[in-house]
Amino acid sequence: MIMLTGGAISWKSRRQDCVSLSTSEAEYVAASQCGQEVLYLREILRDFGFAQAAPTEVYEDNLACVAMSENPVRRKFSRHIDIRYYFVRDLVAHQVMKLVPLRTHNMVADQLTKSLPAPALVKHRDVMIGRVPFCARSLCSATSVSGG
């Protein structure tokens, strides 16, 4: 889900086309697909005269996925991942987007992929429609992010 000025402007929820061997790989594939949308929307904003100087923050609840996006070395556990998904690394290296750790229970997009308890659903819905501001700065904590 991509948000601009407090409201969701783009979202997608579907099964992935490939089989992932780990949650980190699945998150990395999703981040790559998100990166394509980020690149497209940044170009639209630039065409309208709103060029983005800072990287677009993409919130991720999987620390291994964040680490893979920042490290250009292919490791033993990630060497089987299709090269096309390393598009994320290019976007991060060129400062188009940045993966930012966020606690799992604060992921607004979870309402598109998971069955949530009513209080969480209401909280995420209110953020998604812009009723309540999303303040990631107070929610982010690299030391307390849980995977999955």
Feature names for model-found ranges:
Residues M1-G6:
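Acidic, metal-ligating active-site segments
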Residues R14-G148:
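RNase H-like nuclease module associated with reverse transcription
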